[in-house]
């Protein structure tokens, strides 16, 4: 159950990240499709005769901007502005434009006092072929905007900056004939992010972070429980090892024992030979070691240093906790939460084992089958009788046997013994 929950959480977190990334990407693409403004610049080419030098002057700049509903095409003609000095805004439908040309002409109008639609309609009513409105009152003198004039889409209408418009007005007030040629400039696409989309993306991101945070909290809680259960298991195993050690045999080496001979094996822990009056511990596998050397080893490892026999299994104290202790350190990473639940379930079983029970049929529920293959040694095979130790000890030596470290009957050594 824990394994499936962990895998589901991991899959959910990964899927949430991927879906959120794809969603944000598609949402950004939606911005470019739905939230955008397309507008065109206009090249403005003016030609006039300088009255002082009689030279023809031509200026061409990309300073214009087509209106939102304007025809996107070129236009040419003579500039004309409202005749009344007080009505340069062309808000009066009856206002005239001067000078009037016989051919095509373009109206030059100042921004303000009425809508762009009204200005353009009044100029078109006087047969203007195009309308040029120059910006007035903007914080940026060179700013132009895309004029909205819905309903009038059959005429060319552009906006130019205020300085350029003032320049043209001054030329016309000096009675200079100005010819203008308007051509299409650069196409521009301006993208906007809608407020609704920003809120939606923000909410999606918050939900994503909450899911990820919840998964992280769950994951680290599982790891914390696993670490605590493993620590408790180690402490219980240590207590069980101490109880098992108290049931192992202890003897004192005497002069003439075969352990003191030069060809006898040394202690595998300290790599030193046995001397008279040394106290040794005899394990169920019949290997013996210095008591002070092997006891700390058994508390930590619970196995024979030579043959790796498990003393808890040999004495019938094996449990599911011991089997879990033999798992590799990365077992939790390999199987998710199975090890955690198994160790938690094993606490009650271990408590009964440490209390002194030697039930070889102890239940091993929740553990992998591979850990249940090795059965503990039978109590009948344990070397607890002195007669079984005769092949080890010398026939002429005085041997003291004990069955518990707390009930030792060891003679007081006269030499400097080991341990």
Swiss-Prot record:
One of its GO terms (molecular function) is ubiquitin protein ligase activity. The keyword Metal-binding applies. A zinc finger (RING-type) spans 267-308. GO terms for biological process: ubiquitin-dependent protein catabolic process. Pfam families: PA, zf-RING_2. Residues 35-197 are extracellular. The chain crosses the membrane at residues 198-218. CDD domains: PA_GRAIL_like, RING-H2_RNF150. Keywords: Membrane, Metal-binding, Signal, Transmembrane, Transmembrane helix, Zinc, Zinc-finger. InterPro entries: PA_dom_sf, PA_domain, Znf_RING, Znf_RING/FYVE/PHD. Residues 70-172 form the PA domain. Residues 376-405 have a biased composition (Polar residues). It is a single-pass type I membrane protein. SMART domains: RING. The keyword GTP-binding does not apply. Residues 374-419 are annotated as: Disordered. Residues 1-34 form the signal peptide. Residues 219-419 are cytoplasmic. GO terms for cellular component: cytoplasm; membrane. It is found in: Membrane. PANTHER family: E3 UBIQUITIN-PROTEIN LIGASE ATL42 (PTHR46539), RING FINGER PROTEIN 128 (PTHR46539:SF27). This is RING finger protein 150. The gene is rnf150.
